[in-house]
Amino acid sequence: MFGKKKKKIEISGPSNFEHRVHTGFDPQEQKFTGLPQQWHSLLADTANRPKPMVDPSCITPIQLAPMKTIVRGNKSCKESSINGLLEDFDNISVTRSNSLRKESPPTPDQGAASRIQGHSEENGFITFSQYSSESDTTTDYTTEKYRDRSLYGDDLDLYYRGSHAAKQNGHAMKMKHGDAYYPEMKPLKSDLARFPVDYHTHLDSLSKASEYGDLKWDYQRASSSSPLDYSFQLTPSRTAGTSRCSKESLAYSESDWGPSFDDYDRRPKSSYLHQTSPQPAMRQRSKSGSGLQEPMMPFGASAFKTHPQGHSYNSYTYPRLSEPTMCIPKVDYDRAQMVFSPPLSGSDTYPRGPTKLPQSQSKVGYSSSSHQYPGYHKASLYHHPSLQTSSQYISTASYLSSLSISSSTYPPPSWGSSSDQQPSRVSHEQFRAALQLVVSPGDPREYLDNFIKIGEGSTGIVCIATEKHTGKQVAVKKMDLRKQQRRELLFNEVVIMRDYHHDNVVDMYNSYLVGDELWVVMEFLEGGALTDIVTHTRMNEEQIATVCLSVLKALSYLHNQGVIHRDIKSDSILLTSDGRIKLSDFGFCAQVSKEVPKRKSLVGTPYWMAPEVISRLPYGTEVDIWSLGIMVIEMIDGEPPYFNEPPLQAMRRIRDSLPPRVKDLHKVSSMLRGFLDLMLVREPSQRATAQELLGHPFLKLAGPPSCIVPLMRQYRHH
């Protein structure tokens, strides 16, 4: 107590101190300045950017842990039209679009939720029930409150095939001939029952089949001569005493396996049903004009099967029509048995059947060669021993098929049998093993370190990492296999960037499986995305021409290879520090060929989507040209057309209205207007190709890459 006081420890000041990061806040702009890159990505406006969406018709079922049971209600929607549903878009936080979040969103307010029919909520998720006129089965929709300016295929699937197509009182609603631009396109119907972004995480959430009052869905062609005259009828219906099936698998025919132009019958074609009770709750009707006896399901529905232990597992099948006399059509294996080619099969031609996965095929008709994807890896430090010849690539589909089912055709369905075996499922382990065949062995962490997250997208996160030996920075895109809406699209990230190299395409070094994540190592472009420039600065016509020239060179190369990017926008254009422009984000691309000349899946980002994509018409490489035209408007006006409107409403405007225009036409030269008019043509066959646009006089205004550098300096000062 009275001892000698201890000497106070002296702490010296920092030595060799230097300010490397100078942060501040601009009160006029109300923005932070000088933030480090990883901080800026968290505070930037990119969170408000619309996310791309995919067609849910080919979502792959996998085995997942069950979520707690969601109880449904019987409320019906207040309004029948799509407008009543679009009102809620402005009230939803865009942060809910994050596909990598670890928790469920908070429970939405009851006022907004009451606009959606036949649902109740729990932890922010809404469960829907629709009653099909072709099937006395209850189909459960586990959905999440939709997000502002973030639209996925789940949303638009229901946007097309929704339960809101008629008034609450069940009166039929007809589309008039003048309601849409294309006389042959399908009407858009709005059901905004949104699936959560972590779609597979919630597919298996219902632990038992429930019996509730549902809605009877009557979809039929009207007797009018106009191809747009449909009648939609919803009538309340209860089936007391009728046993619901608790084991069922849903089959879709919204495939892109061939040039089928049946615009009216491209509906859910069949259901493969397992009954737990002896009474079959199934009706069949003959589709007009086809004589096909088949049950129907609402498109995009998730059919659940009850596991004996109470866990629910879902199963999907994706056959195409080939046997008009069967209740479940047989897959055309002449088309389905393809060498596993991810750009072709990974996007929207990945057929599945109730008892068999696709087999390998020896020929695929590409533009110049069979493109069986030899193991190409850039000769660099990133090179690791990998599969080098096409013969070493085992067909992923046949590999997965060999793990489960050996039969080559679909057996006839037994609607009343409770002992039928359940359709085969692709487990996570099987899918991971298939993906392992096309990536390189090894762990990139052996030669990379200092991982810093700089961005986040709908499929994964992006980090920068440093090569240990050279100090070179690379970008690493990390995608969790268990958190994808469509796992097959992950193959695009690997194969397209690996096999197609161009000066204006982001270079991929290698890809790996690290645990349950796909890691794609690619070049790091320090200049960031074009979005930063168009948002914070204004571009002159020389700079616009420079960007267009580089993007058109990349598109011309890809289109000649039969590759459709399907997500052209400023977010997909990256810049180097010296102003060079490169195309990136190939996760939503598709391959076309002589055998598969058109696509029909709903893929893209709403504001940039071409009218034919929204209208569900068969499309080709022309959709990228339309999206590029929208991106030109984005470079002129700072945002795409209709950007102040909710995604669905903007899509309806794109579908029904004349091509969008620049806000201030008087500020645009006649040469640029003419260039834009060649891209924003509603009729795809009249739209200019990338090669044709490369010869346009406007592109002669293009300057060197250095003319873009001042723009990067400007937005960094904001």
UniProtKB/Swiss-Prot annotation:
Biased composition (Polar residues): 226-244
Domain of life: Eukaryota
Domain (CRIB): residue spans on this chain: 11-24
Domain Protein kinase: 448-699
InterPro entries: CRIB_dom, CRIB_dom_sf, Kinase-like_dom_sf, PAK3-like, PAK_BD, Prot_kinase_dom, Protein_kinase_ATP_BS, STKc_PAK5
Record bears the keyword Manganese: no
GO MF: ATP binding; protein serine kinase activity; protein serine/threonine kinase activity
UniProt xrefs under SUPFAM superfamilies: Protein kinase-like (PK-like)
Biased composition (Low complexity): 359-371
Primary residence: mitochondrion
Residue numbers bearing the Phosphothreonine modification: 107
Chain intervals for the UniProt region annotation (Linker): 25-447
GO cellular component: cytoplasm; mitochondrion; nucleus; synapse
EC number(s) from the headed UniProt entry: 2.7.11.1
Residues that bind ATP: 454-462, 477
Keywords: Apoptosis, ATP-binding, Cytoplasm, Kinase, Mitochondrion, Nucleotide-binding, Nucleus, Phosphoprotein, Serine/threonine-protein kinase, Transferase
GO biological process: apoptotic process; cellular response to starvation; cytoskeleton organization; intracellular signal transduction; learning; locomotory behavior; memory; negative regulation of extrinsic apoptotic signaling pathway
Compartment(s): Mitochondrion; Cytoplasm; Nucleus
Residues annotated as the enzyme's active site: 567
Modifications made to the protein after synthesis: Autophosphorylated when activated by CDC42/p21.
PANTHER family in the record: NON-SPECIFIC SERINE_THREONINE PROTEIN KINASE, SERINE/THREONINE-PROTEIN KINASE SAMKA-RELATED-RELATED
Subunit-level organization: Interacts tightly with GTP-bound but not GDP-bound CDC42/p21 and RAC1. Interacts with MARK2, leading to inhibit MARK2 independently of kinase activity. Interacts with RHOD and RHOH.
Family: Belongs to the protein kinase superfamily. STE Ser/Thr protein kinase family. STE20 subfamily.
Known role: Serine/threonine protein kinase that plays a role in a variety of different signaling pathways including cytoskeleton regulation, cell migration, proliferation or cell survival. Activation by various effectors including growth factor receptors or active CDC42 and RAC1 results in a conformational change and a subsequent autophosphorylation on several serine and/or threonine residues. Phosphorylates the proto-oncogene RAF and stimulates its kinase activity. Promotes cell survival by phosphorylating the BCL2 antagonist of cell death BAD.
UniProt protein name: Serine/threonine-protein kinase PAK 5
Upper classification of the organism: Eukaryota, Metazoa, Chordata, Craniata, Vertebrata
Gene it is expressed from: Pak5
